[in-house]
Curated annotation (Swiss-Prot):
GO cellular component terms listed in the entry, alphabetical order: cytosolic small ribosomal subunit
Listed transmembrane segments: none
Protein name: Small ribosomal subunit protein uS2
Entry keyword Ribonucleoprotein: yes
Keywords assigned by UniProt, alphabetized: Ribonucleoprotein, Ribosomal protein
Presence of the UniProt keyword Ribosomal protein in the record: yes
One Pfam family from the record: Ribosomal_S2
Biological process according to GO: translation
Cross-referenced Gene3D superfamilies: Glucose-6-phosphate isomerase like protein, domain 1, Helix hairpin bin
Species of provenance: Chloroherpeton thalassium (strain ATCC 35110 / GB-78)
Length: 250
């Protein structure tokens, strides 16, 4: 089972919060101490809360549902894309478009447009249009891929979202909360944890901290889906065996 270790969190700098003057008082329960004007996060609580979060993520993934990864800040975008793809999950790593969740039907239209252009490339349509038309379509595709590429295979709303930096991704938080979609998040000392269902208190600016926690979430999903597949394979084998037994008895 995926698990975060205190030593690894310490090495990644996950305990370093923000300047004390920039803190959110609601993060007080997760703060260990103040040192040189910086809040230090209580990593024992991080480990405990991360365990709860990873178990919950695994439970969702084991049902075959999707968890949307969100992280558009410079330090997070490459990690979010890599780990979400590794786990076979959708992601937003460039820009959160208002309505991505609350107006998903409209977003789906843009995704269908992207898929349509990609089919045109494959089926030979590009060979039958002018160079100018082809260039316009390619520019449109590049724009759509940049913003929607990570969710191009998402056909319905996610069962949950996992995000880095609650403050930066406040629109995503607001949309998920309004729809009752569970929110998992790395929450730093300058962020408001009020609307987050599963708070993972940690440094959301350090690349190593982001990578460690995000990869653990991906691991939890991969482990859970592997167990699900094993269970399905075992069930299929049992059904086949029972059918063979009935045939033999007949």
């Amino acid at each position: 089972m995926a698990q975060l270790k205190l030593e690894d969190l310490l090495k990644s700098g996950a305990h370093f919060g923000h300047l004390t003057r920039r803190w959110c008082p609601k993060m007080k329960p997760y703060i260990f101490m103040e040192k040189n004007g910086i809040h230090i996060i209580d990593l024992k609580k991080t480990v405990s809360l991360a365990d709860d979060a990873l178990n919950a993520v695994g439970a969702i993934a084991s049902t075959g549902k999707e968890i949307l990864f969100v992280g558009t800040k410079k330090q997070a975008k490459a990690i979010v894309a890599e780990q979400a793809e590794r786990a076979g999950m959708p992601y937003v790593a460039e820009r959160w478009l208002g309505g991505m969740l609350t107006n998903f039907s409209t977003i789906r239209q843009s995704i269908r447009r992207l898929n349509s252009i990609e089919r045109m490339e494959i089926d030979g349509t590009f060979d039958m249009i002018t160079k100018k038309e082809r260039l316009m379509l390619m520019r449109e595709k590049e724009k759509l891929v940049r913003v929607l590429g990570g969710i191009s295979k998402m056909t319905r709303l996610p069962a949950a979202i996992f995000l880095i930096d609650v403050k930066k991704e406040h629109i995503a938080v607001r949309e998920a909360y309004s729809l009752g979609i569970p929110i998992f998040a790395i929450v730093d000392t300058n962020c408001d944890p009020e609307f987050i269902d599963y708070v993972i208190p940690a440094n959301d600016d350090a690349i190593r901290s982001i990578e460690l926690i995000t990869s653990s979430v991906a691991d939890a999903i991969i482990d859970a889906t592997a167990v699900q597949k094993d269970d399905e394979d075992a069930a299929a084998t049992n059904l086949a065996s029972e059918a063979q037994d009935e045939k033999s008895e007949a």
